[in-house]
Amino acid sequence: MIRHSTDRQFSLGAGCVRLDGPADSKIRLVCEGTLKRIDMRALADYFRNTADQFATGEFWGKLMRAACMLCAYTGDADLRRIVDDSAADMMGIQRPDGCLSTVPDALQPQGTHGSDLWERKYALMGLLSYYELSGSAAALDACVRLVRYTNTQVGDPPRTPITETGWAFCGIESSSILELSLIHI
C-alpha cells in the first residue's frame, strides 16, 4: 500500500485476517472457479490491440485487483504465477511514454464511446494492486508513467478538461481516475 506522511488510516495488510467456514470456501471457489480460469492475456489484448470498444479495458484491472487480494489471502502459488505473468504482460504492453490505453492515439483521451479514462483507471488499479502484493518497482513505475501520460492529455486547456470526457454526467466516470492518480503527487 502506498502511504503518505499525512495519512491517518490504513487498510489492514495481507494476512491480518483469516476467515473460515462459508466465507473462506467462497473465496477459494472464486480462486479456483474464476481467477485461475480467466484468460488474463485475452483481457490484456484490448490494450494490446487498441480496438476502441466500449468499456472492454475495465475487466483486466478488476480481475487483477481481485486476484492480487485473493493471492495475498490464500498464498496460492498457481494464482501467484498467473498474477505475476499477467502483470508482466500488461507492463510489456505499456509504451515507453507511459500510454496504456484501449483507444488509438488519435481518439485519446476520450475514445469513440468515452470510456478511455475509465479503462485506464482500472488498469492503474490492477497494477497498483500488483505493486501492493509484490512490491515490484517496475509495477509502481508503470503506474507513475501511466499517470504522467494521462496528465499530458487531461487538465487545463490546451489539454482536455476531465469534465469533457466520459459518456455521461460531466465526466464523473472519468474523474474516478483522480484518486488513484495521487501516486503522482
Task: Give each language-model segment a name.
Residues 106-117, 140-165:
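Asp-box/WD-like beta-propeller blade repeats and closely related beta-sheet repeat scaffolds
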